[in-house]
Amino acid sequence: MGEGIQRLGAMEEIFGRDRLTEGLRGKVREMIMALAEAELAEVLAAGSYERSEGRLGYRNGKRQRSISTGLGATVIELPRARISAGERDKEWQSGLIARYQRRARSVDQALLGCYLSGANARRIRGALSPLLRGAPLSKSAISRLVGRLEALFTQWRSRSLASEAVVFLYLDAIALRVRIANKVISVPVLVGLGVKEDGQKVILDLELFQSESSSCWEGFFEGLISRGLKRPCVVIIDGNKGLRAAVEKNWPGTAVQRCTVHKLRNLERYAPRHALEEVKTDYHRIVYADSLEQAKKAYRDFISKWNKLAPKVVVSLEEAGEELLTFYRFPKSQWKSLRTTNAIERLNGEFRRRVKTQSSLPDARAAERLLFGLIISGQIQMRRIDGWREIKHVSPLKAA
């Protein structure tokens, strides 16, 4: 507490005394107490010192309570009362302020925001000292907030997906460093991101697995399908073989779009250094063509040109084949959104930016909870895809 007070004093030396906030804080104190008095009067069916035949209880003094609001900590006096409940009376409990509440919801939201940004308890106390104004903030208080987040995550993970009309489905993995069995290792969090008929993106599920093997991706699929997710029009994926096998096993014949950016990275690994730019230019003629017909011609030209000059490059291209061109079968306004898994890559970037202050996460559940918290707290925003107004014209495709 002393540290917080010292920091607050230092801030006042820098910025001067905040008389406006002090005045508003006093008004907030008066307003909270007035609201509590009005709430109690309604419950008792009688105001303070008012005689009434319909009285449902009686007042029993007041008690002091310190509460932190968006304007800082303030001490209020809450009325106490006994309420008639049959043969026995019971103590009145305000619906405005819960029994053990010490902070307004806005302060708890700020606490959670700091936690999700990677701050520990000491840093949180420092960052929020103007709000807390010396009020205690223990590790257990933060743990209770995290516990509420955990409960919400568990509920979210079991929600039905039957009503989610997903047209496009992006599947990819995010690598995080997590401590497992006393060793810090890099593990994938499998992510399913859907695009609904109104163009809005929605995270369908995220789950940490030990690898991106076929069995792990199949387990991820089983979770989605068991919760009611229906087959989408197209699935956008990278080149992971386990993921591709899981798509075919669970939704055989579903159209697949291979990420064109991931494939370019693969081609670059096999391209001769002196020919790298030329390979990229020829590849771009395939994935940035004006039509499917032009793309197919560019594809054939690429193979014809590089088959002898860089055969491994051609083998890599043919591994994906026409699944690189699936997006051309959709409205042109949607091509940019459909040809890559960038929708999840952007999430990956946001996640990494927020966890870079932590060398590793303490366990698997903490990693999942952190990603979930960043999404539901609004710290990560997802916009509609390009060309969403034309989604109504999209119909299921057969595999290329």
Task: List the predicted regions and their residue ranges.
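Solvent-exposed alpha-helical segments within well-ordered globular domains of core cellular machineries
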Residues: 34, 38, 109, 122-126, ...
